[in-house]
């Protein structure tokens, strides 16, 4: 708003468009939270998209007949007439061996997941993917256990405060499982 952007509604999604207009790809360094999005840049005739740091929101894609087909679920790509369904034996073998796929490949040949912390541009049939975020682990061994506990507490409170900001109601479900 301070930089002259006019918002048409109260959706937090509109912030992405204005952030892209203002900062371009560097907008990703200013985002916090879970997201997967695509923006069409009509001036550059380029599709730009990204996935959140931890990959909470899914994003799948393929390139067929010079077009990028994408979605939050693989089934939407499978239904597209330009995609020819074929099993990916490499991904299947990895999954059956490790019970998890660490690769960007899926069970379907040519369909990939955009990895966490990655963004892409698609211009004139050419897909370019790059990593925009990587975790850093700088252990400060001079701190005491109590200092670490206080720092974690501060970070958790800060994170919860930031995630309460939304254009829809926010809630929390605690199931008593290990991830709650």
Located regions from the model:
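Cysteine-centered catalytic environments shared across enzyme families
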Residues: 1-180
């Amino acid at each position: 708003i301070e930089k002259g952007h006019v918002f048409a509604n109260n959706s937090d999604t509109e912030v992405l468009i204005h952030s892209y207009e203002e900062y371009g790809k560097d907008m990703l360094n200013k985002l916090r939270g879970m997201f997967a999005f695509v923006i069409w840049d009509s001036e550059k005739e380029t599709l730009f998209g990204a996935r959140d740091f931890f990959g909470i929101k899914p994003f799948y894609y393929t390139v067929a007949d010079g077009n990028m087909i994408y979605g939050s679920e693989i089934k939407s790509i499978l239904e597209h007439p330009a995609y020819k369904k074929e099993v990916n034996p490499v991904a299947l073998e990895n999954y059956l061996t490790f019970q998890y796929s660490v690769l960007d490949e899926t069970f379907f040949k040519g369909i990939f997941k955009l990895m966490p912390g990655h963004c892409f541009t698609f211009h004139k049939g050419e897909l370019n993917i790059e990593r925009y975020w990587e975790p850093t682990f700088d252990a400060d061994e001079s701190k005491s256990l109590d200092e670490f506990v206080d720092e974690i507490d501060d970070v958790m409170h800060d994170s919860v405060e930031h995630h309460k900001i939304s254009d829809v109601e926010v809630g929390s479900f605690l199931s008593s499982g290990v991830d709650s």
